[in-house]
Amino acid sequence: MIIHKEQVDCILPDGTPGKKLIVSYVDKEGNVKFLQYPIPKEQMFEWKYATKATADPPFQEYDFENNCFKIDENGNPIIRQWKSYDNKYIKRKEVNKLPELRLNELLNSFGKAVDPIFEMNIPNTWWCDIETDVTDEGFPDPEEASTPINTISLTKFPKTIIFSRKDLSKEDQQWVQTQIDNYSKDNNGTDITKGYEFEFKYFTTEKEMLEAFIDFIVPITAIAGWNFLGFDWLYIYNRCKMHGIDINRLSPTRNMTTFKITPRAGGNTINVKIPYHKIIYDYLLVYKTWDMTIKVKENNTLDFVASKALNIKKVNHVWGFKEFYEEHFKEYVFYNCIDTILLEHIDRVLRTAEIWFMLASVLRQELNTAFSTIAPTHIVMCNFMYPQYKVIVDNHKIGEDADYEGAFVWPTRPGIYKYIGGLDFALTYGAYAA
């Protein structure tokens, strides 16, 4: 199961500068592994439509398994020619960076040798939740991240860990441990919260706490939470930037990619930076996209979903979050721990993330591409047609040749019409419609 594909600068075996393809994937043990391939210069191209005279020339098909050219039953060479999916002539155009579909063709060309990168394996995941300082104006905007992070909860059975910039006595730490052990038994008679070992990590400053948190998650395969990308991770990222913390070290290539969150009900798109080759995801987004277990979704809060999936709710409290933190800190820490413990068990019961992992594996695409609507279709088409020596060609038009045809748009037909109608089902291209 592919996490990310990335092209980085390198020195090729012949001593010249070029590109190297790095593919991160999840192995059978749930850990991150890498495929690295210096891309030969003759492979640095994209396909363009051509005439018969300028087209890529025919060639004799080669059998890589047996290291010989292929012939038919009559002993004649089997001749092939690369063409577009619509059976038109094409040619190669040199590029400095391969487009996504060319990367997919490259992986297809490796045959069964790369089958392990497409296996459906479950990543080792830590569940995360943060609590921030709250002012009289309410909760801070994660894009501004104007107040410090108070605590960070990380859970993966049998550990539940709190990173905190406020200390907690040993006696109160033991109280939290006891409350965790008994929480599910007291609320629904189960043992789902029993067996977790509570660990408390105190730091004198928020910067020290965030540095330790980043150090802790560097070797982790996956980290997830509820509404995690749009709040928790975005908040952590922005607070790290404010403190000058090197968050890029989360990626082995020290590079970041962007995950875009667009609210379905409108609003501005949020661009969230995610390190290459690490799985950082939002279980709320996964749940809203693929869950079919909870039939009636009154709302998408963690409290509601936990009550339906586990028959247990979040820790109830009567205080405002400012008072909660300042005057009832041990309960505050306990509250933070239970959120991540419940989320871990929601995943075990609903198994919604496995649908996401399965789609990425079966469709042979990156994990986050599975959230898209168009890209997966292109990749599936590419995978299907490549063995037939057919490819998808970039036919982008500009200027007067441009058309409006797209994913859900019919070709424009110039003419005079008496009646014109338009149907907008959560318009994908709202910015253009304006």
Model-derived regions, located:
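Short, well-ordered loop/turn elements at secondary-structure boundaries
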Residues: 120-122, 147-148, 217-222, 230, ...
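Residues immediately flanking
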Residues: 128-132, 228, 283, 423-425, ...
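Conserved RNase H-like, two-metal-ion catalytic cores of nucleic-acid enzymes
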Residues: 3-61, 68, 102-222, 409-413
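Short helix/loop capping segments that flank catalytic or ligand/cofactor-binding pockets
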Residues: 135-138, 162-164, 233-234, 289-291, ...
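Common nucleic-acid-contacting/processivity interface regions adjacent to the catalytic cores
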Residues: 320-434
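Conserved DEDDh/DEDDy metal-dependent 3′-5′ exonuclease domain
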Residues: 153, 163-297
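Extended, Lys/Arg-enriched charged tracts that mediate electrostatic binding to polyanionic substrates
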Residues: 106-137, 247, 251-273, 382-399
